[in-house]
Swiss-Prot record:
Main location as per UniProt: cytoplasm
Top EC class, one word: hydrolase
InterPro entries registered for this protein in UniProt: AAA+_ATPase (IPR003593), ATPase_AAA_core (IPR003959), Lon_bac (IPR027543), Lon_bac/euk-typ (IPR004815), Lon_lid (IPR054594), Lon_proteolytic (IPR008269), Lon_Prtase (IPR027065), Lon_prtase_N (IPR003111)
Family classification: Belongs to the peptidase S16 family.
Organism: Treponema pallidum (strain Nichols)
Entry annotated with the keyword ATP-binding: yes
Gene Ontology annotations for the cellular component aspect, listed alphabetically: cytoplasm
Entry annotation: catalytic residues: S767, K810
Lon N-terminal domain segment(s): 94-287
Protein name: Lon protease
Compositional bias annotation for Polar residues: 49-59
Residues where ATP binds: G440, P441, P442, G443, V444, G445, K446, T447
């Protein structure tokens, strides 16, 4: 393919006319080629000559130069030249050269760069044959165009001169002569040869109208060229010298900034009048574009002038200040900024003295010294804190209650306590802060409850965790003497929320550590204590700051590791685990929509029946919270999304999730009901335990081995639990001897092994005392414990059942595990009121005071004591939920 390098470099430059006009001035022959009509000047066979009176002078004037060029190229004597009409000399078959830029109009002298090997061979062949080539524009840019990729109308051009390039290409100087239309294809592929039909301009209509159109075109172009520096004076002169209307239209079209398609359309118009009218439209577009450019240029000039004026004024002002000694530097700007902030806060007492002193020291310090940077950072920190008094709280208690209900399902006791707290706060009109400690297993919503409190009272929320930290500087900051010192987390949070009365959540206070760098728990005491936090001193700030307006919300999994002084300062709200029905509702309302959106699925893509969600909870997510349930749902929806992407399912088809599909996606159930089956054996009993993760059921089992008397305990029991096991064995031996349940030497001839499964999990506490005693009694009497019965209670050495803790969590765990009856200490009867009614519904609670009562309930049909002694035992009290 051929490229016109002038066109490629500047879209506003006419197609080869920059070179044409320059050649026309310096070389008369070029002018003759451009302005001559229906004639060709070439060597060796013919000599240039016109057949019209108007063109004869130009042809004669250019004849010597063209003849010399012909002799130089062809080596033919001057006498061999002749004058032949152009139409007779133009070949009927031409080699076609594809053009990629723009079409080239007739009457143009321009260079062409030929780089394609096939095109080079085509030019060489045409040069040695007729000396003419056909130029056709490519419709779309392709690597190897064929004749079908070319427009049918093009220009035939005479090869004036060719120069071989070092890379094998050609630089060809051509003179275009006339339009043609491809009539027949001789060679479809390169080199492309076609039979052509030559086209002449059609001039129809009133000559005066044609003349008026010519004058109009020239006038429009004159106006356009005067305002456009891209149009040279030489172009304007050449345009005026052209006397043919069609060539004037061609010339103007070639120099306008229009698309190659528009230029091709102009090339194909043979009616000169229509061609000139088409060019008028293009000139109008160019003038509109030029007007927009002029407007943009004027705007830019105005901006530049304004910027230059401001620059000169600033320089002048700087010079004046230098003369008067009033130069403003960064240090002065810092002084003004800090002074304005200090005045706006109206500091008093120690704080005012400290910031004034620091500002004065800063004014005497070199800005390039490290001390200046330290002082400036300190002042920026002090002045970025919210020192102003907090605004009065305004919130609607009903809306707050509604907000809590929207954010959390269940947790009725927790929400009730929070609403009570907000009601008291509203009645007292007190903006003072408070300390709330949310205690519960992971995943029950402690953090989200804290966020809901902040939303309910319209306060900003800030959260940070103290789990694992062992440096008190995290709470109280570093002293300024250290490089890179920073304030503690509390003041950093206040800088972020920009108010003195936010809601601060301090997570994982039960996991706070201590080490060589101080005790963070002790540092928290000063932060939380209402008697001290009105004048809290951060190590970095070293100024009193009032923290008493902050609402502190602490979270923990257990209160056991928390220091007692810290517990005394907080109002404890316990969040127990969820039962299965609550988890199902939480999944339907929150978790299913959340995980569907997370995995790019629509709500209508999946449908869950209640019993399917219940199966998912029961088999894969029995923990106290709902994080495991969320992970299971997330995995289900990931698997479903994968099948949709792989084409195994349609995105629009609704998936009805069932137990089989859950098993396919999640694998075998994580939890099984084997515990109740295992408990229905001699030497087993089910107890209830409470941990930081919530309540849980505990299977206790025992066996005897003939041999020397011994008592072995396994299952990672703690010291307290081992003591409970020893008490259980001692009481049972005494009770068996009194009631003559077994022979006196039964214990002497057997080794007893008591075990609690899940040996990898540490276990401790006294509440398994009655469970271990019941297990040993079952082993002694070879009786099975009543099915679906669980128990909890501490046993004393005299057989009394003592109260325990965590009854609510244990009851929830029992319901989750399918337990129907619970034996519990009578002293814990008050704790039943804290258990929600929907948890107690359908369950039976046996309140006992002695171990004899426990045995009478655990073995209702078996022999417990020797005849005549049962009446000595009190009857247990039974409550139904």
């Amino acid at each position: 393919m051929a490229k016109n390098t002038d066109i490629e470099h500047d879209a506003h430059e006419p197609a080869g006319h920059g070179d044409v006009r320059e050649s026309a001035v310096e070389n008369p022959s070029a002018s003759a080629v451009s302005d001559g009509e229906e004639r060709a000047t070439f060597a060796p066979e013919v000599a240039p000559q016109t057949d019209t009176e108007s063109a004869q002078g130009a042809a004669q004037e250019s004849e010597p130069e063209v003849q010399r060029a012909g002799e130089a190229e062809k080596g033919v004597p001057e006498k061999a030249k002749a004058v032949v009409p152009l139409d007779e000399l133009l070949p009927q078959k031409v080699h076609l050269i594809p053009l990629t830029g723009r079409p080239i109009y007739p009457g143009i002298f321009t260079p062409l760069l030929i780089s394609d090997e096939d095109d080079v061979r085509s030019v060489e062949s045409a040069y040695s044959d007729s000396g003419f080539i056909g130029l056709c524009l490519v419709k779309t840019d392709t690597q190897n165009p064929t004749i079908s990729d070319l427009y049918e109308v093009g220009s035939v051009a005479r090869i004036v001169k060719k120069i071989n390039l070092p890379d094998g290409g050609l630089n060809v100087f051509i003179s275009t002569q006339k339009r043609f239309r491809i009539r027949k294809h001789v060679h479809h592929s390169k080199p492309i040869v076609a039979a052509v039909q030559y086209l002449s301009d059609l001039i129809e209509g009133d000559p005066l109208e044609i003349k008026a159109l010519v004058r109009g075109l020239i006038g429009e172009m004159k106006e356009l060229s005067e305002n456009n520096p891209l149009f040279s004076e030489e172009m304007r002169l050449n345009m005026i010298n052209i006397d043919h209307p069609g060539k004037i239209a061609d010339f103007i079209a070639s120099i306008l900034n229009i698309s190659k398609e528009e230029q091709q359309r102009t090339l194909e118009i043979l009616d000169v009048r229509k061609r000139m009218e088409e060019v008028f439209v293009y000139i109008k577009k160019e003038k509109d574009l030029l007007e927009i450019q002029r407007k943009i240029q004027n705007d830019l000039n105005s901006r530049v002038e304004k910027n230059q004026r401001e620059y000169f004024l600033r320089e002048e002002l700087r010079s004046i200040k230098e003369e008067l000694g009033l130069t403003t530097d960064p240090k002065e700007r810092d002084q003004r900024k800090f002074r304005a902030l200090i005045d706006s806060f109206h500091f008093e007492g120690e704080v005012k003295e400290a910031v004034e002193s620091e500002l004065e020291k800063l004014s005497l310090t070199d800005p390039n010294s490290p001390e200046y940077s330290v002082g400036r950072t300190y002042l920026e920190t002090v002045l970025s804190l919210p020192w102003h008094a907090p605004e009065k709280e305004e919130y609607d208690l009903k809306k707050a209650q509604k907000l809590l209900d929207e954010d959390h399902y269940g947790l009725e006791n927790v929400k009730e306590r929070i609403v009570e707290y907000l009601a008291v706060r509203k009645l007292r009109a007190d903006t003072k802060g408070s300390i709330i400690l949310l205690v519960g297993p992971p995943g029950v919503g402690k953090t989200s409850v804290g966020k809901s409190i902040a939303r309910a009272i319209h306060k900003p929320f800030f959260r940070f965790s103290v789990g694992g930290i062992s440096d008190e500087a995290e709470i109280k900051g570093h002293r300024r003497t250290y490089i890179g010192a920073l304030p503690g987390k509390v003041l950093q949070g206040l800088k972020i929320v920009k108010t003195k009365a936010p809601v601060f959540m301090i997570d994982e206070v039960d996991k706070i550590g201590s080490g060589a760098r101080g005790d963070p728990a002790g540092a928290l005491l000063e932060v939380l204590d209402p008697e001290q936090n009105t004048t809290f001193r951060d190590h970095y700030l070293d100024l009193p700051f009032d923290l008493s307006h902050i609402v502190f919300v602490l979270t923990a999994n257990s209160t056991d590791p928390i220091p007692r002084p810290l517990l005394d300062r907080a109002e404890i709200i316990r969040l127990s685990g969820y039962i299965d029905t609550e988890k199902v509702e939480i999944a339907k309302r929150h978790l299913v929509p959340k995980t569907l959106e997370k995995n790019g699925l629509k709500r209508a893509c999946v449908s869950y029946r209640k019993e399917v969600l219940l199966h998912l909870v029961h088999s894969y997510a029995r923990e106290s919270g709902v994080r495991g349930l969320e992970k299971s749902l997330d995995k289900l929806h990931r698997k479903l999304a994968t099948e949709i992407v792989l084409g195994k399912r349609s995105f629009d088809d609704k998936c009805l999730m069932d137990e089989a599909l859950i098993g396919t996606f999640l694998g075998k159930p994580v939890f099984r009901d084997d515990m109740l089956k295992d408990a229905n054996k001699v030497g087993t009993a089910v107890g209830l335990a409470w941990t930081g993760m919530g309540g849980d059921t505990l299977l206790v089992e025992a066996i005897t081995i003939p041999g020397k008397a011994s008592f072995k305990l396994t299952g990672q029991m703690g010291a307290v639990m081992k003591e409970s096991a020893s008490i259980a064995l001692s009481w049972l031996r005494r009770y068996s001897a009194q009631q003559r349940i077994a022979s006196p030497n039964w214990f002497e001839k057997r080794a007893i092994h008591l075990h609690i499964p899940e040996g990898a999990t540490p276990k401790d506490g006294p509440s398994a005392g009655i469970t271990m005693t019941t297990t040993l009694f079952s082993l002694l009497t070879q009786q099975k414990v009543k099915p679906r019965l669980a128990m909890t209670g501490e046993l004393s050495l005299t057989g009394q059942v003592l109260p325990i803790g965590g009854l609510k969590e244990k009851t929830i765990a029992a319901r989750r595990g399918g337990i129907k009856e619970i034996i519990m200490p009578k002293a814990n009867v008050r704790d039943l009121d804290e258990i929600p009614e929907h948890v107690k519904k359908g369950m039976v609670f046996h309140l006992v005071e002695s171990m004899e009562e426990v045995l009478s309930l655990a073995f209702p049909k078996g022999k417990r004591v020797r005849a005549g002694t049962a009446a000595q035992s009190a009857s247990p009290e039974t409550l139904t939920g």
